[in-house]
């Protein structure tokens, strides 16, 4: 079996566009995601959060408006990789593996604030004013989430034996 046929049998896709519609639909419907990081001893820690995603370009980009808690900060300092998982009772799932980085640029904070207010993708997001005074509030911190792997599986495909679709960022 050549590598191209292996990729197809595993559901691997070359372009994010091949999973964008289902990614947006599932994330927009589920909204809440489990974010998992690991500590210095490799032990996982999960928390439920709402990231937002920009999916209109060739490659997706995520953002998380959050508090810079000591645990999250220590975990990401030791290992910037994190995973976000979405699941619905219809067995629709999205898993996003990212490299996370704290961003302190005021323009980026305003941009992320607006993404939350307007929903990105539609359905995801919320009014961050319920937690913070505005994008300049020092408690409002932003994580840039650069996906390197995204796996999408619709429940109807699961029961039909269709493999999940996996997109990976090409780092050359």
Indicate where each model-derived feature is located:
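Short acidic, glycine-rich loop/turn motifs
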Residues: 37-41, 55, 86-89, 154
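A short mixed-secondary-structure module that forms the rim of ligand-binding clefts
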Residues: 52-91
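Charged, gly/pro-rich active-site loop segments
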Residues: 2-15, 95-172
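Short, basic/aromatic recognition patches
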Residues: 8-32
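Structural detector for hydrophobic anchor residues on beta-strands
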Residues: 31, 60, 96-98
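Conserved beta-strand in the GNAT
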Residues: 47-50
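A short, Trp-centered hydrophobic/proline-enriched beta-strand micro-motif
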Residues: 25-40, 82-86
């Amino acid at each position: 079996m050549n590598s191209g046929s292996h990729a197809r049998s595993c559901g691997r896709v070359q372009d994010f566009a091949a999973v964008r519609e289902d990614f947006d639909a599932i994330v927009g419907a589920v909204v809440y995601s489990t974010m998992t990081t690991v500590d210095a001893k490799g032990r996982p820690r999960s928390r439920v959060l709402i990231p937002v995603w920009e999916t209109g370009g060739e490659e997706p980009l995520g953002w998380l408006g959050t508090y810079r808690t000591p645990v999250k900060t220590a975990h990401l300092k030791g290992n910037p990789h994190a995973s976000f998982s979405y699941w619905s009772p219809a067995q629709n799932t999205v898993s996003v593996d990212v490299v996370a980085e704290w961003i302190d640029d005021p323009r980026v904070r305003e941009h992320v604030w607006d993404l939350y207010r307007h929903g990105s993708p539609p359905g995801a997001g919320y009014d961050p004013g319920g937690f913070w005074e505005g994008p300049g509030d020092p408690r409002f911190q932003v994580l840039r989430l650069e996906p390197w792997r995204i796996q999408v599986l619709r429940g109807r495909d699961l029961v039909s034996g269709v493999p999940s679709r996996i997109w990976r960022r090409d780092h050359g």
